[in-house]
């Protein structure tokens, strides 16, 4: 065993000789500053989404929606079969937006942000819960959704997703 101890002592002494005179580098103590651009990008993103909601969701434009039966809408290029699948709950929403207690302005902003999120993350189906309440958001939400270019169709949600107080929204996702 003393042979191994001697070998270790020799190794340590060789190492000490090799690193003798080495000094610590001064740049090893520099602290990285956080990137300030992330805050600016977040502020720009929020303002862009707010301006998008103002651009797409007009209160003055009233699209021609079917007044009879459940609330539904489909663009001209969307098959009626897709609307049936939406009505039956074949499409399961990946994103839920609950607008209970929001003002019209907040609801517009959140709706625009949800659609932007869905397009960015390639989510094809979302559920918007507008509630029943005083019927303000219940009337306005379908009008706003019908104006947005990324909305292919929407239909009153099945009971498991909110029934009369919710809409299932089918979104178009641009191909990359």
Swiss-Prot record:
Subunit structure: Associates with collided ribosomes, but not with correctly translating polysomes.
Entry EC no(s): 3.1.-.-
Family: Belongs to the SmrB family.
All residue ranges annotated as the Smr domain in the record: 97-172
Transmembrane segments annotated in the record for this chain: none
GO molecular function: RNA endonuclease activity; rRNA binding
PROSITE patterns in the record: SMR
Keywords: Endonuclease, Hydrolase, Nuclease, RNA-binding, rRNA-binding
SMART domains: SMR
Pfam families: Smr
Gene Ontology process terms (BP): rescue of stalled ribosome
Family annotation (InterPro entries): Smr_dom, Smr_dom_sf, SmrB-like
Domain of life: Bacteria
Function statement: Acts as a ribosome collision sensor. Detects stalled/collided disomes (pairs of ribosomes where the leading ribosome is stalled and a second ribosome has collided with it) and endonucleolytically cleaves mRNA at the 5' boundary of the stalled ribosome. Stalled/collided disomes form a new interface (primarily via the 30S subunits) that binds SmrB. Cleaved mRNA becomes available for tmRNA ligation, leading to ribosomal subunit dissociation and rescue of stalled ribosomes.
SUPFAM superfamilies with a match to the protein in the record: SMR domain-like (SSF160443)
Alphabetical list of NCBIfam families matching this protein: PRK04946.1
Official protein name in the record: Ribosome rescue factor SmrB
